[in-house]
């Protein structure tokens, strides 16, 4: 409709973003198609002819896969033809596309609206496949002799493709009927969980092409079988904070759980484990080699894969190659560590802070609300009558009395963090100005937190008794957050542990996680907080750890 004389008109459908027509991409034998898609936009990929795989998981022919907010590559061993088209705009955490209502500003000029896409002839996939075959030979030997399967540690700098290699090796193992345990030690992004967690998962079935590792259990149907992760909370940005004093005990507890699972499950024992690590451990910073040694010892690593760093490879060769493992059976079987250097894929790209922030927000949103991306592939696998499907979850909102909760927080100040935090809700409630400056909040619980040592809570530490002795006098930096509820609690995550509310700080630190709450609002005057929970009913009376420092504030998850 035009306004006479002014030549102004309302926005018409012709002015909105018009997707480009589908594009066919033909890949020759041994090549791959690399693509980047922004958050808020989506592309659709269909395999028309031949065979292809994404990080080791095969694509089904004539099924449409939807990708959003990803940097990935589709590889073909024998050649294939792909059809790429533009998908629907996906709402981001603030409810809009990344560049407005339509999201057209985030669409690129590549096929289907990719920000970047090209075909590469040189790939390291043959190297990665050879690693799989070598591991498979070790698994066959383990089955024949009764030994444990290979325990693989993947090291490399940031953006070197460590997680991609872990996915490829896991997908290839499940394809031949193996059941590997995959361990994620990178708190920067979660595996089948939210950021700030360390997880271990036994993979018995295929992974989800569109969602990476797949999905954890939910109250609804799933086209691909869900995975059951064991989750520990590490609400700090990297393992080197507090000189690894918090990270190492959690790794030890996770390793103990993995070892127990392997002792009870013959299939996982023969297959072994695959450990993915954060890139900061390969940056040569003080304390990183000590943490690597701790991981190698606790998980009794037999194979170390080094990607994209000659310096790190040289160090690992010097420290570990052909050295005995820490496994209990190493002395009897003469089990030794092997260090292998792998090429970094040319498709590895830098993921800036803005992209990683979007990744974290997407993982948190998916945990509470499900996957907003409509998938025709999932619809076909589930035999749904609709042409597309997406998993929509409905979290339960409820108000809680903060006084009834036992909320704990790690009192570790980062080097770039201002320790003087302003929180008006705390004024007028502290008795610091009373005679002698007494404070009931720092009573027996706080004193107990200061007196508890690491030595009482780290079971099964192999070959690191000297390190424990050195840290035995250190206190667990975990302190209870007294009422009233601080305003900074809003828009953050709370991890509900399996520990009792009055458990020691060491027990809370080492406890696995039941689930997570999202704090939508804080009413300090009434002493209540409004939270989102994945299930209904009252919150279990357990110790709760505040993810204040990591993953930090998540604004806009709810209105």
Swiss-Prot record:
GO terms for biological process: mRNA 3'-end processing; tRNA splicing, via endonucleolytic cleavage and ligation. Keywords: ATP-binding, mRNA processing, Nucleotide-binding, Nucleus. InterPro entries: Clp1, Clp1/Grc3, Clp1_C, Clp1_C_sf, Clp1_N, Clp1_N_sf, CLP1_P, P-loop_NTPase. Pfam families: Clp1, CLP1_N, CLP1_P. ATP binds at residues 32, 71, 159-164. Residues 415-483 are annotated as: Disordered. SUPFAM superfamilies: P-loop containing nucleoside triphosphate hydrolases (SSF52540). GO terms for molecular function: ATP binding; polynucleotide 5'-hydroxyl-kinase activity. GO terms for cellular component: mRNA cleavage factor complex. Residues 466-479 have a biased composition (Low complexity). It is found in: Nucleus. Belongs to the Clp1 family. Clp1 subfamily. Required for endonucleolytic cleavage during polyadenylation-dependent pre-mRNA 3'-end formation. Component of a pre-mRNA cleavage factor complex. Interacts directly with PCF11. This is mRNA cleavage and polyadenylation factor clp1. It comes from Neosartorya fischeri (strain ATCC 1020 / DSM 3700 / CBS 544.65 / FGSC A1164 / JCM 1740 / NRRL 181 / WB 181). The gene is clp1.
């Amino acid at each position: 409709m035009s306004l006479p004389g002014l030549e102004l008109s309302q926005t018409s459908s012709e002015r909105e973003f018009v997707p480009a027509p589908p594009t066919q991409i033909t890949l020759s034998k041994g090549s791959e198609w690399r693509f980047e898609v922004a958050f808020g936009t989506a592309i659709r990929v269909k395999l028309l002819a031949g065979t292809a795989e994404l990080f080791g998981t095969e694509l089904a022919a004539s099924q449409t896969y939807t990708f959003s907010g990803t940097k990935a590559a589709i590889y073909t061993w024998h050649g294939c033809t792909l059809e790429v088209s533009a998908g629907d705009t996906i709402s981001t955490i603030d409810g809009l596309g990344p560049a407005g209502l339509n999201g057209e500003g985030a669409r690129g000029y590549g096929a289907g609206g990719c920000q970047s896409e090209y075909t590469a002839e040189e790939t390291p996939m043959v190297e990665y496949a050879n690693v799989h075959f070598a591991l498979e030979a070790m698994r066959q030997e383990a089955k024949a002799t009764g030994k444990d399967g290979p325990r693989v540690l993947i090291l490399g700098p940031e953006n070197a493709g460590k997680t991609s290699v872990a996915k490829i090796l896991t997908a290839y193992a499940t394809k031949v009927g193996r059941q590997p345990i995959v361990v994620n030690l990178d708190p920067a992004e979660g595996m089948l969980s939210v950021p700030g967690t360390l997880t271990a998962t036994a993979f018995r079935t295929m992974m989800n092409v569109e969602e990476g590792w797949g999905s954890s259990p939910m109250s609804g149907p799933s086209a691909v079988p869900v995975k059951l992760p064991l989750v520990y909370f590490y609400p700090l940005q990297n393992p080197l904070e507090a000189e690894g004093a918090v990270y190492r005990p959690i790794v030890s507890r996770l390793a103990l759980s993995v070892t127990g699972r392997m002792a009870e499950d013959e299939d996982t024992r023969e297959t072994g484990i695959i450990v993915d690590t954060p890139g900061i451990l390969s940056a040569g910073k003080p304390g990183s080699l000590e943490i690597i040694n701790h991981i190698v010892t606790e998980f009794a690593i037999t194979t170390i894969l080094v990607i994209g760093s000659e310096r790190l490879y040289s160090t690992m060769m010097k420290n570990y190659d052909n050295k005995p493992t820490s496994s209990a059976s190493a002395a009897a079987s003469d089990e030794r560590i092997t260090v292998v250097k792998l090429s970094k894929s040319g498709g590895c790209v830098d993921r800036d802070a803005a992209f990683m922030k979007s990744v974290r927000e997407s993982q948190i949103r998916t945990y509470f609300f499900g996957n907003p991306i409509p998938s025709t592939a999932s619809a076909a696998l589930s035999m749904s009558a609709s042409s597309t499907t997406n998993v929509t979850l409905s979290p339960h909102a409820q108000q809680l009395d903060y006084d009834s909760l036992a909320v704990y927080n790690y009192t570790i100040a980062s080097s770039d963090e201002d320790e003087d935090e302003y929180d008006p809700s705390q004024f007028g409630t502290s008795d610091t100005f009373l005679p002698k400056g007494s404070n009931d909040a720092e009573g027996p619980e706080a004193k107990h937190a200061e007196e508890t040592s690491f030595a009482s809570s780290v079971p099964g530490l192999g070959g690191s008794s000297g390190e424990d002795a050195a840290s035995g006098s250190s206190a667990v930096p975990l302190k209870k957050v007294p009422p009233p509820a601080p305003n900074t609690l809003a828009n953050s995550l709370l991890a509900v542990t399996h520990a009792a509310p009055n458990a020691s700080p060491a027990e809370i630190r080492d406890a696995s996680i039941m689930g997570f709450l999202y704090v939508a609002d804080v009413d300090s005057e009434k002493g209540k907080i409004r939270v989102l929970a994945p299930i209904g009913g009252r919150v279990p009376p357990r110790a709760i750890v505040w993810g204040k420092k990591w993953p930090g504030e998540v604004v806009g998850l709810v209105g």
